[in-house]
């Protein structure tokens, strides 16, 4: 049994500068490397080949940073307020989070209307604490109910809560983009989620499971992620129903849908510049991902 360890991994990390959660490729810690090595000796003797030097290994941190020190704390703060656990600064964490991360978490919750200026939870915050999704996504759902487009927002919100089911293999990116283009809609990648959902649901009802898996492969879709999307959608709908949020019976137009989405993305707005990129909050410049239907 062989294990080939490149010594790197994508690690979710919150950027205090850009205020977004990122997935940079980083060198793994010694503990992670040793865990990978252990996989080659579980059922039989094996060999682990590390694609980095011993000096590199010894220079690495002993353990990976705990997640509470590399994630946005808005959801943690919201649940602590909901459970009345006291000030987050006074809570006896095993690994206390950074003070700036706590401040950023409160800033986001205030932006969403979940807390007031004093840091006390609002009615919106109490509703958000009941939803099994990130506060930004939960805020979209609450506004979707108010705008009369909760049915569509439940689909989009559940898509944002899971890994994108659309795959772009490095050697077949153009073919994948062409396959995914059938669900694109001019002016909105969010509408593409709705089109993909409707397309998958119609195929799911018409095909056997093996035929459905083949359809997914032909269209560069990950079947397991689509199943996770459906399960997350089911959970969101059940929670919304328990909260008394009513789904619209008639399809909603694009305007109320995007108004609802905007409620959770206020700090993610950007203006297109003459150079073709976008200027966002805090003068941050960014580009659309090549897989976006708007990037073409």
Model segments located where?
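Second RecA-like catalytic domain
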Residues: 1-4, 52-296
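Conserved segment of the helicase C-terminal RecA-like domain
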Residues: 2, 8-60, 74-78
